[in-house]
């Protein structure tokens, strides 16, 4: 989501670091460049003004100008101020479940903003924390909205309240309360009806539901792809419904990212979760320091490790590591790695969490980050014999033609896969001797050139 902002800020930082001793005029110029970068990313003007003033005030201090590395000092100040802009206290960013079960969570937002998917993701997260969860759809207006939530719930073996045709939202709430008590649910998540735009009827209904439920959390789902409209939506919901926190959806989209930097400022409510993609596992706890590091191209290794740990089987990873060191990494291992990468959101998602990624995104053929490529490569490898997977060197021209036909792909795509396999094998053997930045620039980056 922050690709453009990250790239623009990285260019500014490179100038600062390479300048050596900085004058006040150079700092002024850098701050103007930062202001333009934030404006181009749809960050709200009042947010930019306050941010620049804070950074400039600290950056013009004598300790910065006279420091050994003034450029690095300014980057540090920008990083700290961005954390301050995004951060809330830890107690408010954590999901509040402090109530006698069943605990009620109310999910609100505009139609099409990712509210129903976010409800399912949150339910799965709580289920994985050994909570008994019930999902309840209160959207009786959008066709098949209730069925959509039921399908999501069923896909991850979570209970959803049975649908009664023609039942009104407030009646559904009362039935859900009874069911939750009888069946001893720990948490009940209520997915409210959305509207194409905010209206009084929508707000009155949400207020009536909230009054009955007295939820520990009223979470507003904000679509990060809506830009400045996200700020207007957040302000209105915050003022009329007294939300307790925010979930930013579609953060993996190719958008400017300004909404994330603006909504917390205007609502003074904590961002609690970041939602990306359609997979129900794609929900992460918000952490201001890690997001600021990601925006400033410092990487987010902690999130990377956490995501990898939740997806990659440790025993299999250790076996692969041993094979890499011994030089026995074959196409079966390659396939396993590609599947793990796919589960983690694809190459683009992984690169965005590694330090220095912003500098190489311009050098990468973006079409090669497409998740479809992994699916195509999977089809190609599955068209090979076991012998070919274990001994890729035996795959000659006639074998490549047969494999391509079996996978429904071109011979060129088979050639590309085999080339990438060899490149990855070579890169992997060197990883133990390289830090993440060098790996990214000298190794992985070459795979997409």
UniProtKB/Swiss-Prot annotation:
InterPro entries from the UniProt entry: AAA+_ATPase, P-loop_NTPase, Signal_recog_part_SRP54_M_sf, Signal_recog_particl_SRP54_hlx, Signal_recog_particle_SRP54_M, SRP, SRP/SRP_N, SRP54
Compartments where found: Cytoplasm
Primary localization class, coarse: cytoplasm
Single GO MF descriptor: 7S RNA binding
Sequence positions that bind GTP: 109-116, 191-195, 249-252
Catalytic activity: GTP + H2O = GDP + phosphate + H(+)
Alphabetical keyword list: Cytoplasm, GTP-binding, Hydrolase, Nucleotide-binding, Ribonucleoprotein, RNA-binding, Signal recognition particle
Biological processes annotated in GO: SRP-dependent cotranslational protein targeting to membrane
PROSITE patterns for the chain: SRP54
Domain notes: Composed of three domains: the N-terminal N domain, which is responsible for interactions with the ribosome, the central G domain, which binds GTP, and the C-terminal M domain, which binds the RNA and the signal sequence of the RNC.
Family per similarity comment: Belongs to the GTP-binding SRP family. SRP54 subfamily.
Protein role: Involved in targeting and insertion of nascent membrane proteins into the cytoplasmic membrane. Binds to the hydrophobic signal sequence of the ribosome-nascent chain (RNC) as it emerges from the ribosomes. The SRP-RNC complex is then targeted to the cytoplasmic membrane where it interacts with the SRP receptor FtsY. Interaction with FtsY leads to the transfer of the RNC complex to the Sec translocase for insertion into the membrane, the hydrolysis of GTP by both Ffh and FtsY, and the dissociation of the SRP-FtsY complex into the individual components.
NCBIfam families, A to Z: ffh
Name of the protein described by the UniProt record: Signal recognition particle protein
Organism: Rickettsia prowazekii (strain Madrid E)
């Amino acid at each position: 989501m922050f690709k453009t902002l990250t790239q623009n800020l990285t260019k500014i930082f490179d100038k600062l670091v390479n300048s050596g001793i900085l004058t006040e005029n150079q700092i002024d110029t850098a701050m103007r460049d930062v202001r333009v970068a934030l404006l181009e990313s749809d960050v709200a003007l009042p947010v930019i003004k306050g941010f620049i003033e804070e950074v400039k005030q600290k950056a013009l201090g004598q300790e910065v100008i006279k420091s050994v590395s003034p450029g690095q000092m300014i980057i540090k100040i920008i990083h700290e101020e961005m954390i301050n802009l995004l951060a809330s206290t830890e107690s408010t960013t954590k999901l509040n479940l402090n109530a006698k079960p069943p605990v009620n969570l109310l999910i609100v937002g505009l139609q099409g903003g990712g509210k129903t998917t976010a409800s399912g993701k949150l339910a799965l997260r709580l289920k994985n924390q050994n909570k008994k969860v019930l999902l309840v759809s209160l959207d009786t207006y959008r066709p098949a909205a209730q069925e959509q939530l039921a399908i999501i719930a069923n896909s991850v073996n979570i209970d959803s309240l049975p649908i009664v045709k023609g039942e009104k939202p407030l009646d559904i709430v009362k039935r859900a309360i009874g069911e939750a008590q009888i069946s001893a649910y720990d948490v009940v998540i209520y997915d409210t009806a959305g509207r194409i735009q905010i209206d009084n009827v929508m707000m009155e209904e949400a207020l009536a539901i909230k009054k009955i439920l007295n939820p520990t959390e009223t979470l507003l789902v904000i679509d990060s792809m809506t830009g400045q409209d996200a700020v207007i939506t957040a302000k209105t919901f915050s003022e009329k419904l007294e939300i307790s926190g925010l979930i930013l959806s579609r953060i993996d989209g190719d958008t400017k990212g300004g909404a994330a930097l603006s909504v917390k400022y205007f609502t003074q409510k904590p961002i609690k979760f970041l939602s990306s993609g359609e997979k129900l596992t794609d929900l992460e706890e918000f952490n201001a320091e890690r997001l600021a590091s990601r925006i400033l191209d410092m990487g987010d290794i902690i999130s990377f490790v956490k995501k990898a740990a939740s997806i990659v089987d440790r025993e299999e990873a250790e076996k692969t590591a041993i094979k890499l060191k011994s030089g026995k990494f074959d196409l079966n291992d390659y396939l396993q790695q590609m599947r793990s990468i796919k589960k983690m959101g694809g190459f683009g998602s992984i690169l965005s969490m590694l330090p220095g990624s912003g500098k190489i995104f311009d050098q990468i053929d973006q079409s090669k980050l497409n998740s479809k490529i992994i699916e195509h490569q999977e089809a190609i490898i599955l068209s090979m014999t076991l012998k070919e997977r274990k001994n890729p060197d035996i795959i000659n021209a006639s074998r490549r033609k047969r494999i391509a036909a079996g996978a429904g792909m071109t011979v060129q795509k088979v050639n590309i896969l085999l080339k990438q396999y060899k490149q990855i094998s070579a890169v992997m053997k060197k990883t133990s001797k390289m830090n993440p930045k060098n790996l990214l620039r000298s190794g992985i980056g070459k795979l997409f050139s």
